Amino acid sequence: KTNMELEAEDSGVLLKITRQAGETVPVTEVIGYIGAEGEVVADNSTSAPAAEATAQLEAAGLEVPKAPSQPSPATEEKAALADNEYDIVVVGGGPAGYYAAIRGAQLGGKVAIVEKSEFGGTCLNKGCIPTKTYLKNAEILDGLKIAAGRGINLASTNYTIDMDKTVDFKNSVVKTLTGGVQGFLKANKVTIFNGLGQVNPDKTVTIGSETIKGRNIILATGSKVSRIDIPGIDSQLVMTSDDILDLRELPKSLAVMGGGVVGIELGLVYASYGVDVTVVEMADRIIPAMDKEVSLELQKILSKKGMKIMTSVGVSEIVEGNNQLTLKLNNGEEIVAERALLSIGRVPQLNGLENLNLELDRGRIKVNEYQETSIPGIYAPGDVNGTKMLAHAAYRMGEVAAENAMHGNVRKAHLDYTPAAVYTHPEVAMCGLTEEDARAKYGDVLIGKSSFAGNGRAIASNEAHGFVKVVADAKYHEILGVHIIGPAAAELINEAATIMENELTVDELLQSIHGHPTFSENMYEAFADVLGEAVHNPPKRK
């Protein structure tokens, strides 16, 4: 991806170059020889040093990528492609799909992409982006509440929510970004087909009356809203994230079934608009995949914002009457609301893939570490494999699938340090293991924490709530997990992901300098607290 100068550790003259510019070179491969002037390098001298270096690395427990034993599809002679044939046919234009299509084209492939609806997938059209436009509104409303205390005297504290303008603005944002995705595809000469693609075992894809063929197929059909089978669930007053974002009239009350990321984010939006919101979650806390301490802190903050949160309880029946709903809970209680939001998660979207007879795991397409399915040459990155239902994870899986489709299975998808965030106020983010999981796996761990209550930037911004929590291995100080609740958590967590991906220890991280005044100083303080060295924290008890 870059050109850089490398300083030779030995002096001498360049005797021989064994690899040329533009070649892909495996780790430990010899690329040239330095020696005394006039010295001769034998033609077969490239293999021994490389083999010795490889053996040393493998003995140390490190994985060394191997050059493919057979010529890759990108380098061997190929028959010419017919007009309706492609190196890669991508089915689905969401994050995994469009990313894979563009990456395949960058690698010199002839690529087609099939999309039945709008490009950008759930994230862009009905998920990440639309919810962030609404959550920004909630943030602005929070700002109005503290304006007077900061010396900003508003002529009136009264405001109204114009849902028509809210929805129209959201739609304009979505339109801008979906158009951008199509622009990138066209710029990379990816052929676009609109319609539902029916994929066949012979790697043909039928779109309406047209059939195209791929040497490789990438299935990126994404996911859909998960539903529950209880009486009354089909009421028109029960919405999902697919339709609540187009609601142009605010209900007086909203019952949210599911306290995961989507339910909590949308619940907060409507609570900030003045709607009476009740969240019902079957687990013992909201967003149960998050670190328990962080989850409980968020629950406490949201309760103070007016959201009613009920945990360890489920909905057994919904009764509609008098333009409202009665949700009957399995503990005998009832909730009455004008509308309900079903947000219990998502499941893979398999429409158009019925003919393939792929191996599935609980309804998810089973893939190997190369993103390849049970059928060689057919890959399935993103939500459809259920590994990590996050857009940024889908980007990586799509990228890996495209590279493997073009070059043979040469790259694995490493997703252990994929960050995740909840865009509430305050934000929540995590990367790596929770404290509970780390203790179960490693036994003795160290915990470092630093509160935003002592962070100068947070205090000045009226955002002095929450904390950063670091989980580290007690022996080597390896960073096992980072968890944040507080301002800019979704931005700060990317520092943690980079640190962990590059295997920096706490001791090594503390060699860095963080700017002041910044929210990210709290990251440094939490890392220092792992070792009991945080200057702005009270001394740890011995």
In which residue ranges do the predicted regions lie?
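Beta1/beta-strand and adjacent pyrophosphate-binding region of the FAD-binding site
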Residues: 79-96, 250-262
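Glycine-rich flavin
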Residues: 71-77, 84-85, 102-109, 114-250, ...
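Short hydrophobic core segments
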Residues: 89-91, 197-198, 212-222, 256-257, ...
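Small cofactor-carrier domains centered on a conserved lysine used for covalent cofactor attachment
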Residues: 1-44
